[in-house]
């Protein structure tokens, strides 16, 4: 996998982060390549048909500023959302059961360190994380590039952006989909 993309169970304790913000997400994998011409014709339904698998992911958001959260507001605005790492769980086939999945009832939980787990139900802002596939593919192909089969698309946080600390074990669990962990 590319640097910064890890498998569930990874230990990033030795990594240098300026801040450790956690997002739990559903990651989608494209089953085949998509050309710029095809991307222009996609609907939500045809976009869903491109997905061959999904997994639980944990995105670690970092900051380029040493002072991280204490940086001036405009500096934070320019910087927050810097990629620290992406941790992917086991891939689950995107089968017919997910085509009719009611994402507004999807439950997920996040546990950070020794804090109690926090539960979320239907908390994804798009309600259906596959909704963004056509829009994202039009953007990704807008300069004439074909998006490769196997490309992974993360779809946004189900938990907001809570902070974690060095040494914390982060556990993300999505009912019926899977579980992903990372040791900070």
What are these regions (language model features)?
Residues 156-157, 174, 184:
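Active-site proximal loops enriched in glycine and acidic residues that flank catalytic Cys/His/Asp
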Residues 132-161:
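A conserved acidic, glycine/proline-rich C-terminal tail/linker
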Residues 1-127, 169, 184:
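Catalytic-core "active-site belt" of small-molecule-metabolizing enzymes
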Residues 161-171:
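Short glycine/threonine-rich loop-to-helix capping motif typified by GTGT followed
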Residues 159-162, 176-179:
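Short, charged beta-turn/beta-strand-edge "cap" motif at the junction between a beta-strand
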Residues 114-115, 175-177:
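Glycine-centered tight beta-turn/hairpin loop motif at sheet-sheet or coil-to-beta transitions
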């Amino acid at each position: 996998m590319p640097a910064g993309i890890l498998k569930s169970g990874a230990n990033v304790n030795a990594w240098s982060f300026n801040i450790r913000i956690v997002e739990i997400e559903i990651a989608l994998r494209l089953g085949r390549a998509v050309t710029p011409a095809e991307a222009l014709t996609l609907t939500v339904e045809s976009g869903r048909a491109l997905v061959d698998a999904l997994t639980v992911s944990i995105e670690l958001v970092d900051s380029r500023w040493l002072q991280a959260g204490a940086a001036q507001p405009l500096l934070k605005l320019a910087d927050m959302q810097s990629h620290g790492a992406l941790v992917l769980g086991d891939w689950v086939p995107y089968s017919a059961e997910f085509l009719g999945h009611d994402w507004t009832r999807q439950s997920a939980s996040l546990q950070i360190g020794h804090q109690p787990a926090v539960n979320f139900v239907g908390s994804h802002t798009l309600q259906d994380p596959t909704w963004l596939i056509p829009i994202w593919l039009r953007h990704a192909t807008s300069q004439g590039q074909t998006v490769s089969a196997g490309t992974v698309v993360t779809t946004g946080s189900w938990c907001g952006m809570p902070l974690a600390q060095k040494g914390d074990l982060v556990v993300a669990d999505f009912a019926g989909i899977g579980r992903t962990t990372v040791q900070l």
